[in-house]
């Protein structure tokens, strides 16, 4: 029996590419999982847990070798988003793949919510919810 190594594809909801159209993602690149800025971001995300869930927001953490929250490889994501290994960089991505906000330090809760709530996709979701329709039009 042949085995093929797993790789992230657009159809894999666990990959950043596969999350597109389904989730918003806060991606945090950090030099180390012990970095104080990442600890601060984790605390912010813990405070936002309910509001993040309401907005379909996932949290992906990436150190030089490991990715937590997605199936992608750290080196590939660093190349894709052009983030050097020793840099701390947070990127908030909308469901359509657009970058909503970037930061070289922890992204504050209010800034995250304002960026998401100001996005056209979120306004459409809220409008559809008030009309009693699903957040996404299935066709």
What positions do the PLM features span?
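Non-catalytic interaction/Regulatory regions outside core domains
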Residues: 1-139
């Amino acid at each position: 029996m042949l085995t093929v190594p797993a790789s992230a594809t657009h159809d894999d909801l666990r990959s950043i590419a596969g999350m597109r159209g389904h989730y918003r993602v806060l991606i945090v690149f950090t030099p180390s999982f012990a970095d104080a800025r990442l600890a601060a971001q984790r605390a912010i995300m813990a405070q936002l847990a309910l509001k993040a869930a309401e907005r379909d927001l996932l949290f992906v953490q990436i150190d030089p070798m490991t990715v937590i929250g997605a199936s992608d490889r750290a080196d590939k994501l660093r190349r894709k988003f052009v983030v050097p290994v020793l840099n701390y960089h947070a990127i908030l991505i909308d469901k359509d793949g657009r970058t909503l906000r970037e930061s070289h330090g922890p992204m504050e809760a209010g800034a995250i919510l304002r960026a998401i709530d100001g996005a056209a996709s979120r306004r459409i979701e809220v409008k559809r919810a008030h009309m009693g329709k699903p957040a996404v039009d299935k066709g």
